[in-house]
Amino acid sequence: MILLIDNYDSFTYNLYQAVGVLTKDITVARNDEITIDEIEKMSPAAIIISPGPGYPKDAGISEEVIKTFSGRIPILGVCLGHQAIAEAFGGKIVHAKQQLHGKQTDINLNTANPLFSGLKSTIKAARYHSLVVDSISLPTCLSVIATDDKAQIMAIRHREHPTYGVQFHPESVLTGEVGNMIIENFLNDIAGIKTTKTKSAALPDSERVELKKYLKIVCDGKSLTEDEAYKAMDIIMSDRASNAQIACLLTALRMKGETIDEITGFAKVMREKMSKVNVKGTLD
């Protein structure tokens, strides 16, 4: 079982969906609705600590989880979770050189590290943050395994424990298939969890052509039928459309206004492809 600590962030469920493609045994717990003793009894095979608002020291049980289970259970921290790992081991969190919210930038990877196995040395990834791990005060027990073009820390690992953090968002559509590969690497190669999906290279954008006919309809100011909307969303959710095509479709829909038939067609696919979430505690 994989335990996903929710730091009250909508990206938690993007992470859940990304992990759910690989394994169905996931439990989500809010950072103030679970205890260390309860986690001990659950005996998870891996722990993922989600993004969230604010500073990691204010993220409920997150840092205590890292201090208690690092070295015993594989841990992956994303964004705030990544910062929590650094702070838990004595690092400092500082303001980034620029705020990035919903921006895609180049990330330089140490591909010798198992978290980035099979990836190119530079990828494009989604960033949503105004804080970063301070490189000057980084504890010696942690090493940097990714940076951005300003030499800011984008990923870390513990030198002796299977504990990893990424500042960027592997679960975001802006990161795409490489993000899924990072999550798969963590589960397969680091946590030793047998997943249900085998690693595969991303479909080249040149072969992602199915969405184009629906994109043309909307860009011409016309509306999709319910069936057309269903097929378009199925293409998107099956990872057969490029990020540029998806962005163009969403922009065109926004400009002309979505119809009831379009919303109904989209919703049908989402319901069919949704994953059920095991949540410990309350759900707002």
Regions found by a protein language model. Name each.
Residues 49-53, 85, 251-255:
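A short secondary-structure junction motif
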Residues 79, 83-87:
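Glycine-rich nucleophile elbow surrounding the catalytic serine of serine-hydrolase chemistry
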Residues 205-284:
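Acidic, glycine/proline-rich low-complexity segments that act as flexible tails and inter-domain linkers
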